[in-house]
């Protein structure tokens, strides 16, 4: 039996029984799903159960549950136990992207795409190297493409705020992110029908995790209980296939050189682009924008001053070198990842009987159990971060830089760099970069951004009602 310990404390800890709150089969899992989606929200769902049972490691139910998947998981809700999920000797990532739920393979051409592969599988290393090569080939286009795309987005937001006195950031952001990902990572600008097809593909595969503002009973019966058959996505997937087979042909050429067939590679590419890259960047920027607006004019003034000073020193351009000089911008981006992670759960299956350590105890997990790390509680762990439940913009400046390691996301520590043979997201560095680029673009344009911000973690949208342009 192996031991997994994410804590740096070298103390003897007691072996404790994991509280089991899975309850009555089916009934408790359905009740818990209602709590997760409608009664509590996901943060309160985990936090209340941790508090009630006085344990950050729990056997509990997780969505989607009946009848789409087995709801039982072992929850890891602190910074000590969470990194168990990063250790390939202890956990398997085979088919565990979304826990015990997995859409039919027919959604992805009959292939298990990279997100469902374990690093030990040969195809995983090959396709991940293809992604690295594609990023390297397009590296010089990232910044100019982002700046152009998001300046265009803010032009449209300016017009809407002027005409309607408000603008919904999510609507503009998702279209801009889609365009950026297409231009920066593939090549040709994706048409509107490609954008719509990607959104449909995401919904048809992952509807058990989605709410759409409909009555709970309707969503439960329509979305959450049973997976959709793949034929509902056939026409939209065909549009994605055609876009990537032509626009991404240069990536498919490289895949063939590495030893993958074009047919298999295109399905990996579609999933990684439409799910991992598009959804990941969209969510990252929405949450970052929310907390910058919520923080108000004092932080915005400091960010504007830093951004403009550095850009002046870089001959008026946003550059990689300049972005690295923006210490407050970097800290704010990392604090957003810490405080409100873009991906909030990570999974892995125990490869053998394990002893997992929290800060104050040891817990035995059986081989084959699904482990579910709830990231916001791990990255808001008060044993690691002071003022853990506050958004602290300068947290990672000066001596605080050493805490970046504990910003756990993308299947690794904050300081980990992805490699072809590990499970760290291939676009991890790109995620941090685009957050910093958004801040730079914003504060070269505006002195102040105001809006209505949701109070809970689930309320990510911002209704913008003020965009004060830089005084000329």
Curated annotation (Swiss-Prot):
- Name the Enzyme Commission number(s) assigned to this protein: 4.2.1.121, 4.2.1.183
Keyword check for Ribosomal protein, yes or no.
no
Q: Pfam families from the xrefs?
A: p450
Catalytic activity reads: (13S)-hydroperoxy-(9Z,11E)-octadecadienoate = etheroleate + H2O; (13S)-hydroperoxy-(9Z,11E,15Z)-octadecatrienoate = etherolenate + H2O; (9S)-hydroperoxy-(10E,12Z)-octadecadienoate = colneleate + H2O; (9S)-hydroperoxy-(10E,12Z,15Z)-octadecatrienoate = colnelenate + H2O
| Alphabetized GO MF terms | heme binding; hydro-lyase activity; iron ion binding; monooxygenase activity; oxidoreductase activity, acting on paired donors, with incorporation or reduction of molecular oxygen
InterPro entries for this protein = Cyt_P450, Cyt_P450_E_grp-IV, Cyt_P450_sf
Where are the annotated coiled coils located? none
**Keyword Transmembrane helix included in the entry's annotation:** no
Which cysteines does the record link by disulfide bonds? none
The pathway this protein participates in, as annotated, is: Lipid metabolism; oxylipin biosynthesis
Q: Where are the transmembrane segments?
A: none
What name has this protein been given in UniProt?
A: Divinyl ether synthase CYP74
